[in-house]
Amino acid sequence: MKSSSVAPRLKQERQDDCKFQEGDVNSLELRLGISSDNDQISGGGAASPWLGVGVHPWSLAARQGKAALEQAHQRPNECAVQRENRAASSAQLVGWPPVRAFRKNLSTPKPADADDLMNKVKLCSDEGHGSRCAAQERRSSSTMFVKVNLEGYAVGRKIDLKAHRSYDSLSQALQSMFHGFLSDGIATRDNELQQMEEGSKKRYVLVYEDNEGDRMLVGDVPWELFIASVKRLYIAQDPRVHAKLR
């Protein structure tokens, strides 16, 4: 009788030990929820660790990680922004020691007549022989001396065309310059011409050479155009005098 009563008692003690060990393991279990001392509910069963929170911790952590990734993508990379700013600032530095680009432009002023010079060079290349360039240079200068040659004489003179404003003024100046040459007292090689003139003054015409190398009669074009194209003056004898000799 004693042995039959001892066996159920040992079996009951073993079951109690197993339940006690399971309770210790549950108390030491790691939990992601909010900790609570009331882990046991009435009825002797272990309460679920998620009942006090109401949200599964793994889903909450997933949402938090997703939000952090979205913020990281939307936020600009500070290192990249710093590198771009540093590259932009270094690109604006010129020379050594570093000088800002706009300050370097101020320190090296552009010549005022650079555009005019480029226009003159372009005109010279377009014309080929540079006639228009020479004409522009003569207009811009304050003086314009050209050679004057009298037909039949090897020695010539020079006259400043800028000192005159009309053909009349130029004609009077040439007459005063060549007064001795144009008078009857000068000996010439053409004795027959002197006899036909019978002491009267010889008749001369004023001719000029233009920028194309042609000889033209003075007075056909306006004075400004004449100044722009003349290169040399010639005082030639009137061809009508030679016609009379024939």
Curated annotation (Swiss-Prot):
Task: Cite the record's Basic and acidic residues compositional bias ranges.
Answer: 10-22
Q: Which GO terms describe its cellular component?
A: nucleus
Keyword rRNA-binding part of the UniProt annotation: no
Q: Where is this region: Disordered?
A: 1-22
Instruction: Name the keywords, alphabetized.
Output: Auxin signaling pathway, Nucleus, Repressor, Transcription, Transcription regulation
Q: What is its main location?
A: nucleus
Domain named PB1: residues: 143-238
As annotated in Swiss-Prot or TrEMBL, what is the tissue specificity of this protein? Highly expressed in flowers. Expressed in roots and seedlings.
Highest taxon above the source species: Eukaryota
Q: Name one GO biological process term.
A: auxin-activated signaling pathway
Q: List the induction conditions.
A: Not induced by auxin.
What does the UniProt entry say about where the protein is found?
A: Nucleus
Coiled coil spans: none
Motif mapping: EAR-like (transcriptional repression): 28-32
Quote the subunit structure annotation: Homodimers and heterodimers.
This chain's function reads: Aux/IAA proteins are short-lived transcriptional factors that function as repressors of early auxin response genes at low auxin concentrations.
UniProt similarity note: Belongs to the Aux/IAA family.
Q: Can you say what this protein is called? A: Auxin-responsive protein IAA25
